[in-house]
Amino acid sequence: ATSPGQLMVPANLTVLLKMATPRRYKDSKYMESIAGDIYGGALRGSPELVHSYLRHVRWSSDYGYYLQLLAGCGWTSLPWLRLLAQPTLVMAGTDDPLVPFANGRILASLIRDARLVTIDDGHLFLVTKARESAGMISEFLS
């Protein structure tokens, strides 16, 4: 699940406000309460899956988190997408509150040799549907 950067179909403001703080990485109860709102898909109503995801996340620092947010605010790939000539797999979740599905369509329409694959899941489909995603990637690469 990705977007062209700054010029994208944005998430709902309530989602963006929840992303504005790294609190979810430090407070598992808070993460449990908002994960479905931010990530959608399989994380909606599945505290076990949220806790499983958190066991694999390594927290670094508030500084690093805010730098990552800042990087997303000032860059876009839109002007260069038409220059990509190589075959490109664009994967997008149908229930991704953070990066709405429309962004996948935008990428696929602007990249010359793109293939859009729709995943019936949320933002973290590479984690929640790892085998299915890996199969799609392997098929694309072969």
Q: What are these model-derived regions, one by one?
A:
Residues A1-R23:
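Flexible "cap/lid" loop of the alpha/beta hydrolase fold
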Residues D27-W75, P79-W80:
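Conserved alpha/beta-hydrolase catalytic His-Asp/Glu region
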Residues S60, V99, T128:
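Residue-level signal for the nucleotide or nucleotide-sugar donor/cofactor binding architecture
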Residues L84, V90-A92, D96:
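Short beta-strand/loop motif that positions the catalytic acidic residue
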Residues Q86, P100-S109:
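Short alpha-helix in the alpha/beta-hydrolase fold that links the catalytic acid
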Residues D95-V99, L124:
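Acidic catalytic loop of the alpha/beta-hydrolase fold
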Residues A114-S142:
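Catalytic active-site module of serine/aspartate enzymes centered on a nucleophile-bearing elbow/loop
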